[in-house]
């Protein structure tokens, strides 16, 4: 059986924590898209682990797989694995040979291109990790795959083909000089060959590379349980998100098949759990109809609600709303129900996990953007174009707040121990999305989760 964990909003919904909660029941945890731009925090036995590439389940002794839909920075991968080993863990991580490798020139170009876009207010809020340029090379059939690192002749041929193109892009299109502020080794075939050939040797020596689809299907044939772990969220999916303020891959559930080599009928027979943050947050630019306050350099000039900056700061501080990878403050807002309805439709949620419910505790009133108004019409889901979305006004519903309680005790006692007003809020979410509540996160630790039902 399979279960797919999907972010229903703009990323950072707490997917890693839910993977951790249900992880004991699975044998393999697979990431099917994204790269080391996807920061996630896992708390295990009181220790906190901040990861950006290694699948969350690897912290709990499960087999972790980076699928062919991922883009992999080998340097980050080995840094994270070494750090986990230094803390006494023995992570078992495999990498799809069809996954594409992030190279230094991808990261350089990511920064250059984001600077150019920022002049036109088109910046996507990239982490600068080279994710977008790597996916561009994948689509342009000029990428370097993990399997290429295992063969010296193939690796050299790939680099000799693509590196001159990257040099020309920097020098002739962006009119920049390689050297000084731009690392010359990032555009040097020999330097790249030596560095990435060494990565290939280590991958080979540690037996880390796999034919992903074959590897996973063998596990399924043996009766193993597999969890697909999505990164980011539905509303920054390159097809279903708020384009162009999106990531470069598909965090939605359909990509679990494409990004791993497991058939869509297999994924479809399993569960799809939508992870919902009890309010809204994001890093990056673009519209956000339910935004509270504003963040310099991210909130559009005509967006946000500056008169509610104190409330925004309270939620941001209580929720620790700062990027795991970048440390940037996240924009925050009330829950956006049209966004969630869109996510439920695009992913086919069979259940929901609502996180950070405790962050809103103590507020007298909690609001939800129930619908939008656009040109005098009510919309219950997101419009298809970002330009229309920017013109949407949120229609709010108000809920009575709930007190701050001993959330650890609530998690021990179960769903009925949640404050009544909090349950009313959760029931509203479940009813609107036509999916039951499987879990409620009321704190950062695994033990601070109210587990209602298991998808496995």
Curated annotation (Swiss-Prot):
Q: Which Pfam families match?
A: Adenylsucc_synt (PF00709)
MF term (GO), any: magnesium ion binding
Q: List the catalytic activities from the record.
A: IMP + L-aspartate + GTP = N(6)-(1,2-dicarboxyethyl)-AMP + GDP + phosphate + 2 H(+)
Associated pathway: Purine metabolism; AMP biosynthesis via de novo pathway; AMP from IMP: step 1/2
**Binding residue positions for substrate:** 324-330
- Note on cofactor: Binds 1 Mg(2+) ion per subunit.
EC number per UniProt: 6.3.4.4
Binding of IMP occurs at 12-15, 37-40, 127, 141, 232, 247, 328
| Active site residues per record | 12, 40
Which Gene Ontology BP terms does the record give?
Answer: 'de novo' AMP biosynthetic process; IMP metabolic process
Q: Name one GO cellular component term.
A: cytoplasm
State where GTP binds: 11-17, 39-41, 330, 356-358, 441-443
What are its cofactors? Mg(2+)
Q: Domain of life of the organism in this record?
A: Archaea
Question: Could you say which residues bind Mg(2+) here?
Answer: 12, 39
Which cellular compartments is it found in? Cytoplasm
Keyword terms: Cytoplasm, GTP-binding, Ligase, Magnesium, Metal-binding, Nucleotide-binding, Purine biosynthesis
Assembly:
Homodimer.
What's the stated role of this polypeptide?
Answer: Plays an important role in the de novo pathway of purine nucleotide biosynthesis. Catalyzes the first committed step in the biosynthesis of AMP from IMP.
Family membership, please give it. Answer: Belongs to the adenylosuccinate synthetase family.
Protein name as annotated: Adenylosuccinate synthetase
**What is the organism lineage in this UniProt record?**
Archaea, Methanobacteriati, Methanobacteriota, Stenosarchaea group, Halobacteria
Gene transcribed to yield this protein: purA
